[in-house]
Amino acid sequence: MKRLLRTGLSFCLVLSILAGLMTLTSSCSSHSKSTTTEDSTHLSIGVMPSIDYLPIAVAEQQGFFSRPIDIVRFASPMERDAALQTGSVDASVTDYMGAMLLHSKGLKVSLPIACQGGFRMVFGQGKELSSIADLRNKHIGLSSNTLIDYATERALVDASGKPFPYTRVEVQKIPIRLEMLSSGELDAAILPEPFATIGASKGLKTIEVPNQLTVGITGLLFQDAALANKAEAVKSFVEGYNKAIAYMAQHPRQEWSGALEKLLGVPAELALKIPLPTYTEVTLPKAADLQPILEWMKNKGLVPATYTAEGLVRPIVAE
């Protein structure tokens, strides 16, 4: 059932979200293939508005990259993945499902870095909902064939583990998903941080996503051509990323929360409140984290039954 989009947000929330969207749009439109994949001195990284890429933002803010890094922001998974497919970016922070979808289609990519993020189930404004069990037959916002789709389906089960019915509402862009929750047009949706905290600050109820379904599910996906042809830029990125991890661990958040505000569009009053994961230095994704997602994808017919993701997770080889 189609629902008409109505804005139910406060003026401040509209400004904070739309400001981030304008940054996303301007960043995307200012980059082209000729200035990214064909320039061996630059590395372009596609990102979504989530805390998965906070170490990259901090490294950028603190000047830890010795080679130029272009952070290219996207508002939806579809836009992000299209940019990697067309060579408009050298790499992107993506969920493991997106990585396997592209790899299964023959795109020459590697997943050498695991990222850390955060997600919460957020309930719509004015809804008498407080638990997963309350979501039976409710309208749930998601984007199809993404990690959110997977986590939603796996989360919405009864006490015996049997899936219960709900109405899927396709909403690709995360800020719009939050907007529809705030206006009461959606009953619930899984949102990444910082959007879950932004919603909570406006009175929306949130709970943890059950069974750690959204833990260990994102990484940095590189074009193989970029790894081969931009070795120095990739080395600079890895070194800068690791420096940022150490810096964040050794310094109070007040010293680097500006990255949350400037590059993630988080309102200043929330930058110190957002729950953050424990970020780790560059490390490979775990096969055990990919496997349940891959099985779900096979059951949905998203990848061939014979696809194993072999060769996708590979370390960056130092030159």
Residue ranges and their predicted role:
Residues 57, 100, 153, 197, ...:
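Predominant activation on well-ordered alpha-helical scaffold segments within soluble catalytic domains
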Residues 1-42, 319:
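Short, low-complexity disordered leader/linker segments with a strong preference
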Residues 298-319:
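Conserved C-terminal helix/tail region of periplasmic/extracytoplasmic solute-binding proteins
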Residues 228-304:
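Secondary-structure end/capping motifs
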Residues 36-164, 168-171, 180, 187-193, ...:
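Short, glycine-/small- and polar/acidic-enriched structural segments
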Residues 97, 127, 165-169, 173-260:
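Pocket-lining segment of extracytoplasmic ligand-binding domains
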Residues 50, 78, 93, 142-147, ...:
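Soluble non-cytosolic domains of exported or imported proteins
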